[in-house]
A protein has these predicted regions:
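Metabolite-binding pocket within alpha/beta catalytic cores that recognizes anionic/polar moieties
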Residues: 1-127
Length: 127
């Protein structure tokens, strides 16, 4: 849904961001991540959604907080796609169930245990 041409929740329009978006949950992490961008600018803040843009090696990038949980992340991603994004990197804490994974480890997941309802709207439960 658009309000004055802007996405309802993230408050941006098509063309405000490029293809690549980093997604932390916590809005406070956005500025910390944006400090690594060339020419960072905060372009929106509404509720749990904070958005910064900049570039890395000349490539436009953005960082957008998603808040907590699947529903708010889905809202952010769907609105970001409407504005031109197509590649996302989720960053932040998560839980684990094996002793071999320690705090501070970087994990690139190939699957997950999903015990919530939002992801079922996007992927089969077997994924």
């Amino acid at each position: 849904m658009l309000i004055d041409g802007r996405q309802m929740h993230i408050q941006i329009t098509k063309g405000d961001i490029g293809r690549y978006v980093i997604l932390p949950g916590d809005p406070a992490r956005c500025e910390k991540i944006a400090q690594y961008f060339d020419d960072p600018k905060q372009i929106a803040h509404n509720r749990e959604y904070t958005l910064w843009t900049g570039s890395l090696d000349g490539v436009p990038v953005a960082v957008c907080s998603t808040g907590i949980g699947g529903p708010s992340a889905a809202i952010a991603m769907e609105e970001l796609v409407e504005c031109g994004a197509d590649t996302f990197i989720r960053v932040g804490p998560s839980g684990g169930i094996v002793d071999e994974v320690c705090g501070g480890d970087i994990v690139i997941a190939t699957a997950a245990i999903r015990q919530e309802g939002t992801s079922r709207e996007y992927l089969p439960i077997e994924f």
